[in-house]
């Protein structure tokens, strides 16, 4: 709790959601108590509002059935299920909107088949990506690649549709021919999981919520990565005089102790790097 900058009287409980056969892509649902005002990080936010984290991203099978079940559970969606062609991938996408500002972006790839590295799954994978909506694509992309040393999976220019089309991120259909979105995808280690995506919407000006990305506010609070060399990350941040916090011997679930380094992306998203102490 102290690492979140909360008062001494604050308390927190959590539930950890994770497939039994994985060591990454876990989701921790945290409930803060006696921690001060709780308000949405991205109140009523749309894709053209920047700051904090926009959505978790999962792969699914039979997205129509998942959609039906999610609605019955009380979730809602940004749009109907939307088609998207990303390179060779023929995708169907929908963003589910749940309680406390949580958004889960679901992908079904119709073709080509998913890579074997995705692994087998019955209906839904663990999260493979976390999306940020950013004020400036170049600034965010360089932070992850040049400062943190992440590898690039994809980056490209703004994309607009040749004719009006249903947008998975909710850009109004009549504007999709003139309002573009610019994406970048990075990862600390190349693979099918552990990715971070940043999108800048060009042509629609929204709110900037970066100052609201903090506990105990509601939404996606932070993304954590294991890091074998926290000192190297700290040195990169200090060289550029960027904010950071370092915590040693933090109690971890399971009785372990970790060293923890915390920083923020240019759009306020909290990033934590941890190393389990031997």
Model feature map: region roles:
Residues 1-10:
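N-terminal juxtadomain amphipathic helix
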Residues 10, 15-16, 24-30, 55-123, ...:
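Vicinal oxygen chelate
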Residues 31-36:
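Conserved donor-binding loop and adjoining core beta-sheet/short helix segment
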Residues 45-46:
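Glycan-recognition patch characteristic of GH18 chitinases/ENGases
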Residues 53-55, 128, 220-221:
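Eukaryotic phosphotyrosine signaling hubs
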Residues 72, 136-152, 239:
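Amphipathic alpha-helical segments
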Residues 150, 183-192:
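Acidic, glycine-rich loop-and-strand cores that form catalytic or ligand-binding grooves
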Residues 202-203, 214-225:
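Low-complexity, glycine/alanine/valine/leucine- and proline-rich hydrophobic stretches
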